[in-house]
């Protein structure tokens, strides 16, 4: 299958509207972050019975989207399915962006933001997921950069190697994120099933994100997308949702 990539000229009305919308979201996010810093993180919904505010909730969601999106790119990079090659680049790019977004959410949740760049590395504890996860996150971003470079320059051997590493690393990233929440509040949280449930949720949300992004971007740029590929991704999403529902059923059965 011969696939050729073309750059978007960025002159269409739809493209400009999309950029304006994204710019609006960016400005709103910066203003909201400034407001949180000025007023304190209590404005995100934290109080005595809710130890996590909006940032931590969104950080977990962003990291899940990142890990799930990277798995989609593995359909081409790891398993060699050439029909998914057009989605590989955007999947890796989205994975990197959402992980950075998750890390920014965590940073704004800290009372002393500067410490987050020092403490996990100076006082490293191999038995603490809070020490291990920063290594996983930074490694994830680095792997995505190398993966993108290999995809753009058509380095097939390197793509295969890095894609395989990225595929496994994505599971480690969200397994580590799920392990942070392994506290004794509910039965599922006390068991090894929690990291697995986080991975399942990540794959479901990441696949859903990729379907939305692919369909939207192809329509806005007047490009044709193979319906069969979207249908296959939809079936994969359905399986992931069923797995997530199973975990929810197990959690709430007590």
Residue ranges and their predicted role:
Residues 1-68, 72:
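N-terminal signal-anchor module of multipass membrane proteins
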Residues 8, 13-15, 19-28, 81-83, ...:
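Long, contiguous internal "core" modules enriched in hydrophobic/ aromatic residues
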Residues 32-36, 73, 77, 105-106, ...:
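Short hydrophobic alpha-helical membrane-anchoring segments
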Residues 33-43, 107-117, 177-185, 250-254:
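Membrane-helix interface motif
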Residues 46-50, 55-59, 95, 201-204, ...:
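Intrinsic structural disorder
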């Amino acid at each position: 299958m011969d696939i050729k990539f073309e750059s978007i000229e960025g002159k269409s009305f739809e493209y400009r509207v999309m950029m304006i919308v994204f710019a609006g979201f960016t400005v709103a996010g910066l203003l909201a972050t400034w407001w949180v810093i000025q007023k304190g993180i209590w404005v995100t919904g934290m109080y005595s019975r809710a130890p996590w505010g909006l940032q931590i909730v969104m950080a977990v969601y962003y990291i899940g989207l990142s890990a799930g999106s990277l798995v989609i790119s593995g359909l081409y990079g790891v398993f060699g399915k050439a029909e998914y090659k057009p989605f590989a680049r955007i999947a890796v790019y989205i994975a990197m962006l959402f992980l950075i977004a998750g890390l920014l959410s965590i940073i704004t949740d800290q009372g002393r933001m500067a410490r987050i760049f020092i403490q996990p590395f100076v006082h490293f504890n191999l038995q603490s997921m809070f020490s291990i996860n920063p290594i996983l996150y930074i490694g994830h971003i680095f792997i995505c950069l190398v993966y993108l470079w290999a995809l753009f320059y058509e380095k097939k051997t390197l793509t295969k190697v890095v894609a395989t590493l990225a595929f496994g690393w994505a599971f480690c990233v969200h397994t580590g994120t799920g392990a942070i929440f392994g506290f004794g509040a509910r039965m599922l949280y006390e068991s090894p099933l929690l990291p697995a449930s986080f991975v399942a949720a990540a794959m479901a949300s990441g696949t859903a994100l990729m379907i939305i992004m692919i369909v939207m971007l192809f329509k806005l740029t007047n490009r044709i997308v193979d319906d069969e590929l979207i249908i296959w991704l939809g079936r994969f999403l359905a399986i992931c949702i069923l797995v997530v529902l199973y975990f929810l059923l197990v959690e709430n059965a007590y």
